[in-house]
Amino acid sequence: YGGGLKKDFEKAPEINKKTALNFANLLEMIARSKPKIRIRFSTSNPQDMTIDVIKVMSKYPNICKSIHLPVQSGSDRILKKMNRLHTREEYFNLIDKIRKIIPECSISYDMITGFPTETEDDHNLTLSLIDYVKYDFGYMFTYSERPGTLAAKKMEDNISLKVKKRR
């Protein structure tokens, strides 16, 4: 779940395709075979959190009803600049599915403020997303350049530290 076969599944040998497990199947196998252990996994990117995983989580009492779902921004414009693979609407739809299938599920997030070119309107979209989701807790960070990333190479860090901290 993440790298490896997932990225090149169509190019994989047929035997690999036939024997491959997706994360939902693996999670269910472990939950069923080890009912006395408590299972928790962390940080699933929104585009990787499937309805099948959510259903498996709801089915087994030994799987913690907690999902860390990094969103980074509530603005589609900023998400695109960050090269994130989800949109605001897709994130809302995912949250709605989680709340419907596992009403008691705890949801946490990661958020970055002050990404290059972020406007007050972009920031307000992020605040409205936070209000909608009603997270249990989250991790907030101010943007800082990471060497080697596209943002560091191509974008000017044009948001002042004062504004980043206020947001």
Which sequence ranges carry the predicted segments?
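Auxiliary Fe-S-binding modules of radical SAM enzymes
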Residues: 31-34, 46, 96-106, 115, ...
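Conserved SAM/AdoMet-binding glycine-rich loop
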Residues: 1-120
